[in-house]
Amino acid sequence: LSLISGIFKNADYTMERLVRVAKKLRLEHNFNGYIHLKSIPGASDELMREAGLYADRLSMNLEIPTESGLKLLAPDKNHQDMIKPMGFVKNELIQYKEEKKKFRSTPKFAPAGQSTQVIVGATQENDFQIIQVADHFYKNFDLKRVYYSGYVPISNDARLPAIGAQVPLVRENRLYQADWLMRFYGFQANEILDKNNPFLDLEVDPKMSWALRNITQFPVIIQNASLELILRVPGIGVKSAHKIVMARRFQNLSLEHLKKIGVAINRARYFISVSGENSHLKFLNALNLKEIIVADTKSKFENPFSNQLSLLHDDSFLR
């Protein structure tokens, strides 16, 4: 259940009513399900604290990723109004966890943590800027998730994309994949993109793009490579990587073994050395390796501006 509201009268007035609804659901209607409450920028600390006692997750949506973009569209707003509550919630989460260790009766506070959302494509930020922002909030505010939403043109404002402009859904999806790499695959933001490569490749996923730019790190010898290195092989997901580490203790692994484990062989085979023949390694240093892989791999999104987007953002994108 998501509790969301536009601001009316003022921040505290609106936030108080959101908290009242969450409290009523919990105490009067005995609702024990998941509640995600979108906090109101500028609301008091007291209301933020009370919200965390009744909601499973709190979110403060950043919306526009950079201060310059926000100033362009909303000169009267600033990121600090959104960042300050995130800092408060982070400190409250730490405090309640410490109290819980001492007193079992301590109530839960936002047990599912906090999240934020950024709009993609409304202003001129590149993907490098966006994932740097996400990385900052993950590291400094202990966010559980950053959500990315492609901008849907609904206004004739000249500062925004024109009505009828395509929604960049593949770009949105690539950002989710890059986010997944940072959270679960051990990638740093500045490894995925940099100032010389500020946009994510729409033809291949971010892990494949990284591999193609760092071809000297391959092939990975599956039989003795570290888990961290195996996780960087295109086509190998987190679960498959752990299965590989376990399985190789008992036998030398071939492409057929990896396929049974769940590895996406059509991508991984260009980057790994295994027991038995792997004829695809001959393409590793080919100048047109990307074209070979793209031609050999049916894209999940044939049109980068498709009107349909999968709701699943998991490591199946990056296997």
Enumerate the language-model features and the residues they cover.
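C-terminal extensions
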Residues: 200-229, 255-319
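A structural motif corresponding to the C-terminal lobe/cap of the Radical SAM core domain
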Residues: 81-89, 121-206, 220
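Conserved Radical SAM active-site core
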Residues: 1-116, 120-124, 137, 155, ...
